[in-house]
Design a protein with these regions (language model features):
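Transmembrane alpha-helical interface segments in multi-pass membrane proteins
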Residues: 151-160, 182, 247-248, 252-260, ...
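Hydrophobic core positions of alpha-helical segments in small-molecule transporters
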Residues: 75-77, 145-149, 177, 190, ...
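Gly/Trp-centered helix-boundary motif
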Residues: 1-158, 162, 169, 183, ...
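Non-cytoplasmic
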Residues: 191-192, 196, 200-205, 209-212, ...
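Hydrophobic alpha-helical interface/terminus motif in multipass membrane transporters
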Residues: 160-164, 193, 220, 233, ...
Length: 343
């Protein structure tokens, strides 16, 4: 019944249309104005305005990141700690981290002075050195090592990873190189380099970087394989776009979030490696203040209740920097994901 009514209505409309066409333009003029078609107006300015998108990748990334209040607070605190660590020697009234302070009246060293007494903000160690100055100097040393290691690993790892994943002819070579390097524990290599070479900041940076890039390269390679043969990359190759331009314009922007996350995780990992290698006595010499040396010194007196501050303060700095970099890296990685820009 319903289909029959629709057919009758359709036939009626067709009949009216045929009649109007037969009568000519005069019949159209008799129709009410609201039944006539009204042509849409065209404005070139409005067309341009509606076709333009004001989307900005980095703008959307930072907007998404700043919505995470915990990450923002951690970022502000981390910037303050890192900035103070490097600016602390320039401030007035700061002690030499390697100076063994003595009592001018007796000539005896200020040994194991409690925090807040006799001008020692965080106390002194067993030979009268100011822990406030030594902890910030140790933070500078550890952060410097971590930043350089992260930078070297990023540059080498990204370069090798892109070549490994995009250039098919190099896949076999880099795969075998990865298998060789990955089968040797990085801790063993770090210990051997620290044992053979003289202990220094440069030695630790070299030892951590010589194998650290492997994980970054493999990670980038796997990501490149996912997007290498997508339509826009195949089209770019077909029209003769240089490989370097495809990598810079098509591949690397897609990997910004994961690269930032890997770099953010490399920094606390490098600090942890420095602490470990120094803790076992193969890292920096005891004259060089570092978080590893300070924690090792604090470990020796941790069983004495009145001296546990020597382990507590460097451990707090180490824990905060490590956790902050990890959480901020994860938050920025989530914010850099374009899927989160639509929320």
């Amino acid at each position: 019944m319903l289909f029959r009514m629709k057919d009758e209505k359709a036939h009626q409309l067709e009949a009216e249309l045929d009649k109007l066409q037969a009568d000519g333009p005069a019949a159209w003029a008799k129709l009410p104005e609201e039944e006539l078609f009204t042509p849409a107006g065209f404005s070139e300015e409005r067309a341009e305005a509606t076709s333009y998108s004001n989307y900005s990748y980095w703008g959307s990334t930072f907007r998404a990141f700043f919505k995470n209040r915990v990450a923002v607070l951690l970022l502000v605190a981390l910037i303050a700690v890192v900035a103070f660590a490097f600016l602390q020697p320039c401030l007035p009234g700061q002690a030499d981290p390697n100076l063994c302070a003595v009592d001018p009246a007796t000539g005896i060293q200020y040994r194991n002075i409690a925090p807040g007494e006799k001008g020692f903000i965080w106390g002194s160690n067993a030979i009268g050195q100011d822990l406030w100055a030594r902890i910030w100097a140790g933070a500078r040393t550890s952060l410097t090592i971590a930043f350089f290691v992260a930078l070297i690993e990023a540059v080498v790892g990204i370069t090798v990873g892109v070549l490994w994943g995009y250039v098919r002819q190099l896949d076999f070579f880099f795969t075998e190189l990865y298998n060789i390097c990955d089968n040797v524990p990085s801790t063993i290599i770090l210990i051997l380099i620290s044992y053979v070479a003289s202990p220094s900041v440069q030695t630790l940076i070299l030892g951590m970087s010589i194998t650290g890039w492997i994980a970054m390269a493999r990670f980038i390679r796997n990501q490149i394989l996912i997007i290498r043969d997508r339509d826009y990359n195949v089209t770019s190759r077909c029209i003769g776009t240089p490989t370097s331009r495809i990598v810079v314009r098509n591949l690397l922007p897609y990997l910004v979030s994961v690269i930032m996350l890997r770099m953010a995780l490399t920094i606390p990992a490098a600090i942890g490696s420095e602490v470990f290698i120094t803790y076992i006595g193969l890292g920096l010499s005891v004259e060089v203040p570092s978080l590893g040396n300070l924690i090792n010194d604090g470990r020796k007196v941790m069983m004495q209740a009145g001296l546990r501050y020597q382990l507590l303060y460097p451990t707090i700095i180490l824990s905060f920097v490590t956790i902050a970099f990890y959480l901020i890296g994860n938050a920025f990685s989530d914010a850099a994901d374009p899927k989160n820009h639509l929320q």
